[in-house]
């Protein structure tokens, strides 16, 4: 019997749990399904399989659940240093919050006005077209330098459907943004400036198809926001920053355009894990996976062994490539696991003790071409006193800062801000820091695909490897953010139920 999603969710059918295990794992702890990775995808897969009567064990190397969902408790309150935003279109995440009794609030992270600092000078975006530094050509000249990468990437996006990025009809676009802009005849300066706001790892390192997948999915959230927007709400056309979505706080069905979980986003994986109980095993780092046609075995660094009729691997490929996998040859999966790059985001979360921008007269927030990347000043809705702020590093700057330890990174960023904005001296108090590339159990904030990799393996890399199925945001097909993790969990669980029916 084949179960589609609707049939599975409505059937309530209990799948028999008396499933054999491979002879090689008879001494191991046995389960119907062993899941590696207790992030959202692993937890949701486990929930779905347990609901259908299967015996599940869920392993994670960390001492906490959640993966890249992480809330840090600070003197200023909880701060989400990983996933945090729940959009109106996040159907699966919204359903999970409702099932676990979690409340949502409109995200309070409106960014104050941006200025740009390029080539040693402050740039007024409104007058950029007439600036002597502007060596762009034609319509390029109208785009502020901190927006040109995302603007030009979106301009040439022909994709309409959520899964078009995987359609071979668009295989010619499995190239870098630099190659695309060169083919389209853009000026050298436009291409150089595009590097500072290019989505993904960078203008050379990320396939345009990977960039466009996010852009197409983002359109859905923006259209939902625009449909509900008040006349004064910020629209995409008015944005003065390339990264960080603008929130329309108007409540539609109890939801703003962007929402946060009360108490921090970690409340969701914690609630999911609590329901699963002792099926979740922390401190279990997989070092070996042995596959056959009848079962699989996971060996952990502490010597413990777990065997299952099926496995689900949800850990990022940046970590899976360190696990010894034995089984039938699978060149597509091997290539994906070995070579898939991971982007980085590094953020320094701070309190701005006084609004120093009132002293120097410059815009509160900054996009720069220097090592600081961006500084986001967050509206406190009064304009006076302390404000929250963030140093946000993506692309080149994020890769560069990852060679520094926390103390050196903090000193670099605060020092660079003071160099550009002397009025900021003494006004910055650090709350917390997160560099995902330096996280030893993640090694990046999200998957990427290099030019050529969509054609090489992205379409087929999610297919099961004998009894091992793949989930995690890196296996997304149509979604992004936390919703992509839940999407992949749903797919992997249904794949296994189809094989056991």
Model-based region annotation:
Residues 2-501:
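FAD-dinucleotide binding site
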């Amino acid at each position: 019997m084949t179960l589609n999603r609707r049939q599975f969710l409505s059937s309530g059918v209990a799948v028999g749990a008396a499933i054999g295990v491979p002879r090689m794992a008879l001494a191991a702890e046995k389960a119907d399904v062993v899941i590696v990775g207790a992030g959202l995808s692993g937890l949701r897969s486990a929930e779905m399989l347990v609901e259908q009567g299967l015996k599940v064990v869920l392993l994670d190397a960390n001492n906490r659940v959640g993966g890249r969902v992480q809330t840090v408790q600070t003197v200023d309150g909880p701060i989400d240093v990983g996933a945090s935003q729940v959009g109106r279109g996040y159907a699966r995440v919204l359903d999970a919050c409702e099932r676990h009794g979690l409340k949502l609030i409109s995200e309070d992270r409106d960014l104050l006005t941006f200025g740009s600092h390029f080539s040693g000078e402050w740039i007024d975006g409104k007058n950029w077209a007439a600036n002597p530094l502007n060596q762009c050509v034609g319509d390029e000249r109208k785009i502020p330098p901190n927006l040109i990468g995302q603007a030009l990437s979106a301009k040439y996006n022909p994709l309409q459907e959520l899964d078009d990025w995987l359609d071979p009809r668009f295989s010619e676009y499995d190239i870098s943004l630099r190659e695309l802009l060169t083919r389209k005849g853009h000026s050298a300066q436009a291409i150089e400036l595009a590097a500072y706001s290019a989505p993904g790892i960078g203008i050379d390192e990320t396939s345009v198809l990977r960039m466009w997948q996010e852009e197409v999915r983002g359109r859905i959230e923006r259209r939902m926001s625009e449909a509900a927007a008040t006349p004064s709400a910020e629209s995409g056309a008015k944005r003065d920053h390339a990264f960080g979505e603008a929130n329309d706080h108007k409540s539609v069905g109890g939801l703003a355009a962007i929402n946060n979980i009360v108490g921090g986003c970690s409340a969701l994986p914690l609630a999911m894990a609590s329901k699963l109980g002792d099926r979740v095993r922390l401190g279990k780092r997989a070092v070996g996976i042995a596959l056959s046609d009848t079962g699989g075995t996971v060996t952990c660094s502490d010597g413990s062994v777990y065997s299952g009729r099926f496995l689900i691997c949800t850990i990022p490929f940046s970590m899976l490539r360190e696990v010894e996998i034995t089984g039938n040859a699978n060149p597509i999966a091997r290539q994906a696991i070995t070579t898939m790059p991971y982007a980085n985001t590094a953020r320094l979360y701070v309190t701005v003790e006084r609004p120093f921008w009132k002293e120097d007269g410059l815009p509160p927030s900054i996009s720069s071409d220097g090592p600081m990347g961006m500084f986001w000043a967050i509206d406190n809705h009064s304009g006076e006193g302390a404000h929250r702020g963030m140093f946000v590093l993506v692309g080149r700057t994020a890769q560069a800062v990852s060679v520094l330890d926390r103390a050196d990174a903090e000193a670099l960023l605060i020092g660079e801000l003071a160099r550009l904005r002397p009025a900021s001296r003494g006004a910055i108090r650090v709350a917390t820091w997160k560099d995902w590339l330096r996280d030893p159990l993640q090694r990046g904030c999200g998957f990427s695909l290099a030019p050529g990799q969509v054609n090489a393996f992205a379409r087929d890399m999610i297919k099961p490897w004998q009894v091992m199925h793949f989930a995690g945001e890196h296996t997304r097909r149509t979604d992004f953010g936390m919703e992509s993790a839940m999407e992949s969990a749903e797919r992997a669980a249904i794949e296994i139920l189809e094989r056991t029916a």
